[in-house]
Amino acid sequence: MEAREATATGESCMRVDAIAKVTGRARYTDDYVMAGMCYAKYVRSPIAHGYAVSINDEQARSLPGVLAIFTWEDVPDIPFATAGHAWTLDENKRDTADRALLTRHVRHHGDAVAIVVARDELTAEKAAQLVSIEWQELPVITTPEAALAEDAAPIHNGGNLLKQSTMSTGNVQQTIDAADYQVQGHYQTPVIQHCHMESVTSLAWMEDDSRITIVSSTQIPLIVRRVVGQALDIPWSCVRVIKPFVGGGFGNKQDVLEEPMAAFLTSKLGGIPVKVSLSREECFLATRTRHAFTIDGQMGVNRDGTLKGYSLDVLSNTGAYASHGHSIASAGGNKVAYLYPRCAYAYSSKTCYTNLPSAGAMRGYGAPQVVFAVESMLDDAATALGIDPVEIRLRNAAREGDANPLTGKRIYSAGLPECLEKGRKIFEWEKRRAECQNQQGNLRRGVGVACFSYTSNTWPVGVEIAGARLLMNQDGTINVQSGATEIGQGADTVFSQMVAETVGVPVSDVRVISTQDTDVTPFDPGAFASRQSYVAAPALRSAALLLKEKIIAHAAVMLHQSAMNLTLIKGHIVLVERPEEPLMSLKDLAMDAFYHPERGGQLSAESSIKTTTNPPAFGCTFVDLTVDIALCKVTINRILNVHDSGHILNPLLAEGQVHGGMGMGIGWALFEEMIIDAKSGVVRNPNLLDYKMPTMPDLPQLESAFVEINEPQSAYGHKSLGEPPIIPVAAAIRNAVKMATGVAINTLPLTPKRLYEEFHLAGLI
């Protein structure tokens, strides 16, 4: 798909940051080097649960170049929460504050007990290795089931159950039992890591006015400012956060990670710059993971394929600290409710502490796990009833005018039926399905399909606010200051398209300055929940309309015209009745506004808007694969995602988002799993050699298609797209493997080892 100059949304154009990235001029956090900068390295626990009885750091302190060593005794005794959620005035709804900068009571393999600061990174690493600690080990808990046992050792005061909740539309069990056919399933999903290209790094120093500046690879600069203030008990305004280019986050950097520690260290060392940079192994052990879910599901379906009701009982493993905690399990149940809204639905969930590395936000935020269970059960019902898997979904899919059964919120745009129909045609579903019947050999083909629903922000659970400030420069170009966060997803590019379309200028005349500095940009919580373009759009559009109004008013004075007769097209003032005849360039107008001795001034506009709508996006995955029974190997032949994300703002970027999500979904389905010893809690594969991810030879040609149905609640007709592409992929692959082999496998990932075990039980090998 060709990228070209654009003047509006709906057009493909080159990313505004493309040249900086391909030329190497883009600066990431680790590229920042300052005079006198020091480096910090952690001393981490080799055990998953216990206490540090004593610590000996004499050898480490004697090493030349070591400046300081801090232990749990030296840090503030202030528990804080790290989840990147908008702040709330309701104390009962705030995230659990169960973290300290360092701890004597270690709760997972790799927990931090001390930190070394040295003049160079190698010295800091060597000194950290020289710190000797005597440990008192405690019983290790690795599963929610063990955590909830009566005799389970408490990981935190208050017990191992972090939170539980129940949602229901009524007597769901009775509805399921009354249906013609019932299906049950027990589903398990693994602990996985985000594996973003850039590791976690933070750099902090103290300014002349004693304020702390932090440069960090984060999705949530303005939330980082708040949490650092809370962790160190200093005013939030005394913290300044600079976000340079970010090499991916996928939810991991929606947690406040190393910023509080970097800020603490510089404050203790007289304000010198201190960098805290994690290795890849540390990213596995000490950042965040995807929550492992155990789901017991029931579903009732009539013979004609009508879904009468379903229920899900979820156990969520949040690991050693709360992080995003129960919000993941709760959100997963809420988001899937839109998918098949005309049936009874019950969802109960418990989130438990264990001695695993902490789980947090990851692309899909609970929805991939829940959709895996729902779409597996529905597919099993279709098989048992002899109904085409696409047909059973079409009969139950959300449609315009339906409502979320839990909240009653109306669905104003629902393109799921159109996605299924379009996908069926592009994929040649009937032809491929017919080719996969009655197979007996070692190589067996199967096709599968799965659907999803996903919302466009966090409202009403979280406050959704966004700000935008537009300034016209002397040459007529426009600077856009936004509190939103570009982390590689292309947000700045679509923001420039929004402003260009609304004001009436080329995209090349718009420069977006997203949250690169919390001191100068308007407020916005950050990049998460597929919210960025949806929530930022109203503020951007409002400010753009106001700026356009000011520009035309100034032009009317210059041209002695009524403002009603003028408009802006491609950066030129024109008469509404003769748009093909430019009267004045925006540059000429800007020069007059700045330098005329009497009239004008710098033309600017600002807006801050809270969003109180949250429409669902929909879509589906079609997959064709081959299973080698003898080798227990799955090869994907073709995969297609079809999305209803409303108006597509930039087709080229949208395609890239979908392909990236599909690749992650394939990894979750077939390869990825953190292998954790069930007895010791030790992570056995905290590196990119032993942790298996799909590489280019493992991925087929990724295909995407879109159904554009305007969302009337949206400023530009669009809905979420960032996270949805990953959601249905694993379920579609599982369903295709079932068709190929007749074996329904309900535990991810579908590795050769797991396939061997399941095929052996089924008598295939």
What are these regions (language model features)?
Residues 1-164, 182-185:
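Flexible, low-hydrophobicity surface segments
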Residues 11, 17-20, 89-92, 161-202, ...:
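Glycine-rich loop/linker segments at domain edges
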Residues 16-20, 129-142, 219-221, 226, ...:
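Extended active-site and interfacial segments that coordinate phosphate-rich ligands
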Residues 63, 72-73, 233-238, 267-275, ...:
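C-terminal catalytic domains of large/alpha subunits in multi-subunit enzymes
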Residues 79-84, 127-130, 195, 216, ...:
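Short acidic, glycine/serine/threonine-rich loops at helix termini
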Residues 103, 198-203, 294, 446, ...:
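Short glycine-rich loop/turn motifs
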Residues 219, 457-479:
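Active-site-adjacent "gating/activation" loops or surface patches in catalytic cores
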Residues 249-277, 491-499:
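Thiamine diphosphate
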